[in-house]
Design a protein with these regions (language model features):
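Generic domain-boundary/flexible-linker signal
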Residues: 44, 142-144, 179
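Predominantly the structural core of cysteine protease catalytic domains
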Residues: 78-172, 222
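Solvent-exposed loop/turn segments at secondary-structure junctions
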Residues: 40, 137-141, 174, 189-191
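Short, well-ordered loop/turn elements at secondary-structure boundaries
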Residues: 2, 126-128, 178
Length: 223
């Protein structure tokens, strides 16, 4: 994966990503990736409101106000549990409650058919909606390594995502090889993951459950 890729779809504005590792709560630092991704998604949509004259978001990620926002979500909308984190179905319910409260024209559900993932991701990005994507259990490559490799600056890093939520902010294609990649944010940094590695990765001994654990929060516009 390298720079100079063809952009197939991407968010229209800068996406600010928080970092769960910066939180003092051991529970959020260890299991809060879904909560952080969910909070950043809400703030991005709140900032869209601000651009169109509505109530805005925080404008940045980090600091006391951001921590307070995360804590309120954890208490009221999207509780993080130790050793479990935040599951996708709870995330969809929490998003729909929040959308109704703010009058947003969106509806969310967890998981879509695996073959439709690229299409759904493109649809959401074209509608300027960040895509929360989970990398679930059962992912491994031919060498037996678990998780999905993360790339930065065109090079494979030593970091791998497994049992983890990331946020897709772009979908790209290498003009020479035709290889496609998802541009993501995680732990407050931007990476890329191979679309084929993610889409074709093992889903474990029970594919149905693997598909549920490795999927997206699908948010569609209702108007």
């Amino acid at each position: 994966m390298r720079r100079g890729n063809i952009i197939l779809a991407e968010l229209k504005h800068t996406y600010f990503a928080g970092n769960q590792n910066e939180f003092r709560s051991p529970r959020i630092a260890s299991y809060g990736c879904g909560l952080i991704g969910f909070a950043d998604l809400l703030l991005y949509l709140m900032e869209q409101d601000w651009r169109t004259g509505g109530a805005g978001g925080l404008g940045t990620r980090g600091g006391k106000k951001y921590e307070e926002f995360i804590s309120r979500l954890d208490r009221s909308f999207a509780r993080v549990y130790s050793h479990i984190g935040l599951n996708g179905f709870s995330m969809a319910i929490a998003f729909n409650r929040r959308a109704r409260k703010r009058g947003w024209p969106y509806r969310a559900r967890w998981a879509v058919p695996r073959k439709k993932l690229p299409e759904i991701i493109c649809e959401m990005l074209e509608n300027d909606i960040p895509v929360i994507l989970s990398v679930g259990p059962g992912f491994h490559d031919r060498r037996g390594e678990h998780g999905v490799a993360l790339y930065r600056n065109g090079r494979r890093t030593e970091v791998r995502a497994r049992d983890h939520y990331v946020t897709v902010i772009g979908y790209e294609e290498d003009p020479e090889s035709g290889e496609r990649s998802f541009r993501i944010v995680s732990w407050g940094k931007e990476y890329r993951i191979s679309a084929s590695e993610y889409l074709n990765g093992s889903t474990g001994s029970i594919p149905f459950l693997g598909n549920l654990f490795s999927n997206v929060l699908y948010i569609r516009k209702t108007v």
